[in-house]
């Protein structure tokens, strides 16, 4: 905002939020009151950290605010109890501001209140102007509508009491409707009570302002708003002698009824508007049987006791409707007129249902009657108030179906839902009829099971023992060992029976080494073939190599070990010394 928008500036002490009045500090800030009405901006109260700050700490919107001096209990801090405190309350927060002097406080209060009140006045003027700026074809100004109604009422003959009462009601209701002081014409206002015998009964949910709009619209004001309505929404008087009594219709809010003759002298003021005459004449329909009904009888009661008529042929539906409209509008005098009302928010819910029926009536009747072949409500035999009854009404009892079907009806035009009245056109099937046989082999995607395998001609597989390679010593043990060594080995063999297999392997290697030292030329093959391999066993049925070793005899079993001579000699000497020590202790 520019500096020219500033109305008042100065230092004020600002309060913290209301929940923190006693705990938090009150800060001194530089306040600027700006009025942005001339530039199109809202009225705000800004406060800065100091006088030279460019960005405000907070902007307080004064569109909905109130300002007053603080008078009452001293709930502010002690250091500000004797100061001049005023309150600015907005929709979001309440600000307690402390001024230095009383004059400064008066200036701030006056400036803020002037900005707030002026803003409210301008907002109200803008809202009123937005209402009066609507197109004149839809909503003319209130003064012009009032003058038009007054001129129309003055042009009417004075000998008609109903017309005078209508004009009086229009003038009085217009004065109730106009709430703007600039557009209220007091010279045309009249006071008094409404005579209920002059106008027909209306729905209580409509307000007086709504009624004044509809009555003013009759006098050539809302001419372009008139549109022909279907005959199902007309309400006819039940007795010719009384104009105030009328038969209740399905939607009384959809039309405004004027119970007076249209072709008489009161029609003089409508002669200047051919559009209005054509609109009114197109919406007139008088029922032929309506005059024969007793006073107070309701059309809904008659329809509830009478079955629906036979519907016309689908091809002649549109022709019969046109003939019916032309016959009713041209042959008889109209007894009542239909003026569509201008619906406000109070009657918006009722207007939605009425508008949906007006727009989709032709499509709904054509589709439903052609598809369901149900009775149509455009028959001249019954009143048009049958619109309140369900479209798809069908008698569910045999009596109603029989009475609805006269001698002139054919069963192809109207078929009731009762199966007992009309036999089925389909021929009956014999009781002993069986379905045709089905070839099970022709089913698609049927897979046959493969034949089982024949294992009778196969020969029996015999399991062979695995081939093992054994090695025997060509000479006996005792031929190379002295009697002393033999005794020592036998004693060691029986002393440690747990490690018998290990002992045996080392004894055997020792014998080989002794034999090689005695006759190196004869037994050179022992060193060359010191490592041997077992044959691979591919037969799973044969016993495992470990199990086969256990089954062999002790002399045939050979352990294949690659021996380190130095380690073996050291181990043998250690075992020898250990055995000697144990024997000496015994």
UniProtKB/Swiss-Prot annotation:
Belongs to the GAB family. GO terms for cellular component: cytoplasm. GO terms for biological process: macrophage differentiation; signal transduction. Residues 149-171, 281-335, 401-453 are annotated as: Disordered. Phosphorylated on tyrosine residue(s) after macrophage colony-stimulating factor (M-CSF) receptor stimulation. Residues 5-117 form the PH domain. Residues 283-292 have a biased composition (Polar residues). GO terms for molecular function: signaling adaptor activity. Residues 316-326 have a biased composition (Basic and acidic residues). It comes from the Eukaryota. The modification Phosphoserine is found at residues 344, 482. This is GRB2-associated-binding protein 3. Interacts with PIK3R/p85, SHP2 and GRAP2/MONA. May interact with Grb2. Gene3D superfamilies: Pleckstrin-homology domain (PH domain)/Phosphotyrosine-binding domain (PTB). Keywords: Phosphoprotein. Transmembrane segments: none annotated. It comes from Homo sapiens.
């Amino acid at each position: 905002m520019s500096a020219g928008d500033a109305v008042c500036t100065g230092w004020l002490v600002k309060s913290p939020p209301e929940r923190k009045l006693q705990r938090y500090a009150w800060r001194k800030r530089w306040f600027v009151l700006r009025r942005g009405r001339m530039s199109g901006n809202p009225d705000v109260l800004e406060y800065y950290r100091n006088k030279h700050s460019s960005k405000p700490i907070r902007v307080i919107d004064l569109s909905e605010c109130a300002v007053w001096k603080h008078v009452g209990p001293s709930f502010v801090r002690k250091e500000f109890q004797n100061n001049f405190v005023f309150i600015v309350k907005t929709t979001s927060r309440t600000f307690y501001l402390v001024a230095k002097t009383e004059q400064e406080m008066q200036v701030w209060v006056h400036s803020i209140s002037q900005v707030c009140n002026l803003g409210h006045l301008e907002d109200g003027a803008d809202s009123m102007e937005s209402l009066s700026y609507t197109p004149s074809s839809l909503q003319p100004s209130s003064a012009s509508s009032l003058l038009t109604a007054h001129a129309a009422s003055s042009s009417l003959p004075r000998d008609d009491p109903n017309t005078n009462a209508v004009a009086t009601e229009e003038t009085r209701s217009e004065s109730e409707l106009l709430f703007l002081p600039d557009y209220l014409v007091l010279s045309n206002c009249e006071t008094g009570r409404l005579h209920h015998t002059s106008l027909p009964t209306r729905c209580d949910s409509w307000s007086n302002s709504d009624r004044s709009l509809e009555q003013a619209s009759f006098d050539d004001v809302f001419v372009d708003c008139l549109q022909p309505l279907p005959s199902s929404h007309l309400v006819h008087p039940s007795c010719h002698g009384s104009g105030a009594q009328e038969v209740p219709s399905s939607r009384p809010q959809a039309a405004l009824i004027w119970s007076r003759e249209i072709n008489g002298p009161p029609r003089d003021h409508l002669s200047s508007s051919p559009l209005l005459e054509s609109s009114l004449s197109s919406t007139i329909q008088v029922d032929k049987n309506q005059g024969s009904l007793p006073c107070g009888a309701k059309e809904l009661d008659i329809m509830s006791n009478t079955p629906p008529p036979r519907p016309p042929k689908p091809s002649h539906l549109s022709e019969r409707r046109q003939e019916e409209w032309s016959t009713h509008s041209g042959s008889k005098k109209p007894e009542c007129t239909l003026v569509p009302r201008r619906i406000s928010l109070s009657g918006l819910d009722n207007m939605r249902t009425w508008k949906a029926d007006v727009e989709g009536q032709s499509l709904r009747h054509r589709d439903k009657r052609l598809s369901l072949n149900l009775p149509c409500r455009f028959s001249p035999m019954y009143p048009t108030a049958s619109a309140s009854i369900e479209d798809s009404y069908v008698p569910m009892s045999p009596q109603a179906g029989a009475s609805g079907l006269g001698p002139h009806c054919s069963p192809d035009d109207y078929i009731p839902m009762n199966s007992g009245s009309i036999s089925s056109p389909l021929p009956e099937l014999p009781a002993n009829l069986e379905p045709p046989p089905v070839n099970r082999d022709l089913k698609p995607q049927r897979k046959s099971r493969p034949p089982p395998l024949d294992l009778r001609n196969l020969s029996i597989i015999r399991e062979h023992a695995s081939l093992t390679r054994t090695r025997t010593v060509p000479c006996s043990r005792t031929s190379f060992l002295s009697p002393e060594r033999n005794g020592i080995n036998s004693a060691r063999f029986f002393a440690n029976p747990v490690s018998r297999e290990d002992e045996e392997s080392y004894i055997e290697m020792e014998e080989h080494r002794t034999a090689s030292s005695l006759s190196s030329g004869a037994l050179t093959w022992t060193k060359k073939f010191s490592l041997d391999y077992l044959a691979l066993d591919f037969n799973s049925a044969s016993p495992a190599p470990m199990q086969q070793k256990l089954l062999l005899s002790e002399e045939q079993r050979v352990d294949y070990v690659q021996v380190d001579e130095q380690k073996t000699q050291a181990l043998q000497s250690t075992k020898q010394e250990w055995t000697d020590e144990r024997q000496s202790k015994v």
